[in-house]
Structures are given as C-alpha cells and as structure tokens.
C-alpha cells in the first residue's frame, strides 16, 4: 500500500514514516525542503517536493498514492501562518485527494478543539474536521493532546543543564502520549474497517500538569529544577500587543493557544472504546515514567562516560608536565 505522509519531518510525522517503513508500506513524503528531509530518504522513504500553500504541487505528489496521512501544521516561525497552511492548505489537500480518488485520509486534530473557537489554531482544526467529514472521502480523525517527545526540550533538557524551566502560574493537565504509540494506532487504522469515517481520541493513560512533570524529572535526574512562573496576564498582554503588527499575527495565534493550555483545564478522554476497536492493550502503551526514565538513564550514562574520558585525559597530560 502506498502512503503519502505530509509533515514527515515533524515529531509525529517522522515516527509514522519510520513505523510505516518497518511494516513494509511504500512511503512517500511531501516536503518543502529536500535537504532537511534527507534523513527520511536514508530510512527508505521517497521524497517529493510540495507545499500546501501551493495547491498546484499537490496533484503530482498524489499520483499512485492510496492513503494520505497528514501530520502537518504551521510552525510558530512559519511566515505563512495557521491560516495559509492549516486552513487554505488543508482545503486544497482535501480537494486534491477527492480529485485523485484517495482511498483513505488520516488527519490529526486537537482534543477539545471544538470548545475553543476563540483560538485560531483550535477553530481551524475543527473547521478542517468538518471539511473532511463533508468531503465524501473515507477518513479517520485522531484527536491528540501532546507528545512525550515535546517534554524533553521543555523540561528534561533545561533541568539537566541547570537552565530555567518556564511555566505559567496555572497549568492544564494533559494526557501526553508517545509518538510510537500514536503511529501504531495510525497504521492499525489502515486495516480495520471499524475505523472508517470515525473520530477517535488518542491520549495517554494519565494526565500531567507542569508541576507533576517537573517533580518527575527532578526525581529521575537527581537535579533540582529552576522554575520561573509567567502570569497568564502577561500572555494575554503579549498576544494583544502582537495583534497590532502583521509580523506578529502568527505569534499572537500561538500565544492564544498557549493561554488555553495554561488554564486549569483537563485535556484527557476515555480510551476504553479505542483500545477495544483497535485491538490494542492499554498496558502495551508506554507510560511517561518509563519514557523519561529511559531518557535520563541514557543521558546520565553518556555524561558519566564523557566525564570519565576527560578525567583520564587529564591524568595522561599530567604525566608529561
């Protein structure tokens, strides 16, 4: 089966590419920068240039493709912004999929997006869901909370480096999930008819707020975190200020999203039906404690080896003094 992965260089996209290749699928990746995506080619995927903001590039990329897996979203630094990539680009992609008679379209949205229409990214995700449902295409929509992998840069690395961890004064509890597990559910949906034209939450086994994660990282790393709390009022001011400048529109959109995640909400959902339909045991998914334990064990072991090598070099150089 031939699959086109969009957003393949991202955190989730690259894991889906690797997992799909491991399972024997033919994988093609739509990328804007062939050089930055070279690692995907080394894994065995085929690369084709394309850009969601340029609809004419989509039809050639879909030739010979049976399934679209769309993990793409605009980045905070992307000048095109959420409207160009996440709205116009998605509509163009859905139209192209209809024209090429794609057999299945898998889309990743955000859990509870329909509850936050005031946030541009949330509103656009909800609109895209509706466009897909009304398209006549066979679809599966997964609604996500967050990835384990994103917690490394946000918490683990600064704690190890004795740098500041920035959090807000209030914190949402989020049921993060490992992208390896998300990829497993994604690929399983390709062979289960029960997943056709359905929307599923994909969340971890428990919710974590910032304080919980920091405490876990401190325990596993043996380090004390340097924490700075940012008042939500500051985020609101920053967002309102950014809106005055065209170059700040995308920043303002992201700050609006951050503001939602900073309030005392719960981003979680029952997975009982999902596990049953996908025939996957909940105990087979990775928990955050295990994920971070493996990360810190690997990093601390490497740091110990480096320190040992440096100590040995110093002893050797002292012999010649």
From Swiss-Prot:
- GO CC annotation: what is one? cyanelle
Keywords linked to the UniProt accession: Cyanelle, Oxidoreductase, Photosynthesis, Photosystem II, Plastid
State the superkingdom.
Eukaryota
* SUPFAM superfamilies (UniProt xref): NAD(P)-binding Rossmann-fold domains
GO MF annotation terms: oxidoreductase activity
* Keyword match Coiled coil: no
Q: What biological processes does GO assign it?
A: photosynthesis
Which cysteines in this chain are paired by disulphide bridges?
A: none
Subcellular location(s) per record: Plastid, Cyanelle
Q: Does the keyword Oxidoreductase apply?
A: yes
**What EC number(s) is this enzyme filed under?**
1.-.-.-
Family of this protein: Belongs to the NmrA-type oxidoreductase family. Ycf39 subfamily.
What is the stated purpose of this protein?
Answer: Involved in assembly of photosystem II.
Name of this chain's protein:
Photosystem II assembly factor Ycf39
Which organism was this protein described from?
A: Cyanophora paradoxa
Q: Which gene encodes it?
A: ycf39
